[in-house]
UniProtKB/Swiss-Prot annotation:
A GO molecular function held by the record: rRNA binding
Species annotation: Brucella ovis (strain ATCC 25840 / 63/290 / NCTC 10512)
Family matches, as InterPro entries: Ribosomal_uS19 (IPR002222), Ribosomal_uS19_bac-type (IPR005732), Ribosomal_uS19_CS (IPR020934), Ribosomal_uS19_SF (IPR023575)
UniProt superkingdom: Bacteria
GO annotations of cellular component type: cytoplasm; small ribosomal subunit
Keyword rRNA-binding listed: yes
Protein name per the record: Small ribosomal subunit protein uS19
Alphabetical keyword list: Ribonucleoprotein, Ribosomal protein, RNA-binding, rRNA-binding
Family listed: Belongs to the universal ribosomal protein uS19 family.
Length: 92
């Protein structure tokens, strides 16, 4: 179920403060964050966030197309190694 419109997008407060500091300073540094549930806002466009995936911070550069999505969508938590090969077919 989608979030109701009257509530507005969810963003952790500390994230807004960190993004504002980086914008004011003019630095282009990676903003480390653990809040995968936060929504990407238009003021985050052009910034780079390090989204934690459970083991490391994955760098995510925010673009216009990402606005409205969640940060967690761009940092996969699981590694897919493919399905196991058929051992009988391999032996022949």
């Amino acid at each position: 179920m989608a979030r109701s419109v009257w509530k507005g997008p969810f963003v952790d407060g500390y994230l807004l403060k960190k993004a504002e500091k980086v914008r004011e300073g003019g630095r282009n540094e990676v903003i480390k964050m653990w809040s995968r549930r936060s929504t990407i806002l238009p003021q985050f466009v052009g910034l780079t966030f390090g989204v934690y995936n459970g083991s490391k911070h994955v760098p995510v550069s925010v673009s216009e197309e990402m606005v409205g999505h969640k940060f967690g969508e761009f940092a996969p938590t699981r590694t897919y190694y493919g399905h196991g090969a058929d051992k009988k077919a391999k032996r022949k």
